[in-house]
Amino acid sequence: MISVCIATYNGERFIREQIDSILRQLSSDDEIIVSDDGSTDDTISIINSIDDKRIRIIEGPRKHSPTQNFECAMKEAKGDYIFLADQDDVWKPNKVEVCMKWLQNYDCVVSDAEVTDSNLNPLYPSLYAIMQVRQGRIYNTIWKNGYTGCCMAFRRNVLNASMPFPKDIPMHDIWIGNVAAYKYNVKFISDKLVLFRRHEDTISCNGKGSRFSLWQQLKFRINTIYHIIKLFV
């Protein structure tokens, strides 16, 4: 069974397109769990209008925290395989098939993505290239984070080891990816399985800057390493 976890907040513009792209790839026994963080637009009514029994909507933490919102969704996941999805992207038709093939031999798989504008016009052919993604535990912990949630799928053992999220981690995907890398195994694949929308108000994805100061970035890394060590103590 597959559980797709989506965190939503005021995502009315793109949520139907995203959910439609996911449902087409799921079996009748799979599920989509939507944790909504108090949307004030038509996000919930749009999801309800899809009228598919595989979709389950739960109330999020209402703290405007993507990390806590995803944690709420993951707590409700029943599947043996967990996929993370953002509310505004689009899954390519072969995403589930390709990821499931790799998950037979690896505990976590991370794919590449094509970066587009809000209308799905191509901006960059590879998110990997922009973010300087590569395989390697130390590299992804210390130097560059290569774990992007919407590009990740993992087995239930990774979910169980990751939960509950430590309160001082930088983001959910960074934490999950590092847990998978140090406790289990991770495979980065070159397949571009997501159309990754980059909006004017989203964080820069040019690989050359951050909304966080150097001190904050250092603190995030120290916190991540500390909690990884605690997993083995």
Feature locations, PLM:
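Acidic helix N-cap motif at the loop->helix transition within catalytic regions
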Residues: 16, 39-49, 94
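A conserved acidic beta->alpha catalytic loop
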Residues: 21, 36-45, 115
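Short beta-strand/loop segment that forms part of the nucleotide-sugar
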Residues: 29-38, 58-60
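Conserved nucleotide-sugar donor-binding catalytic segment
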Residues: 135-207
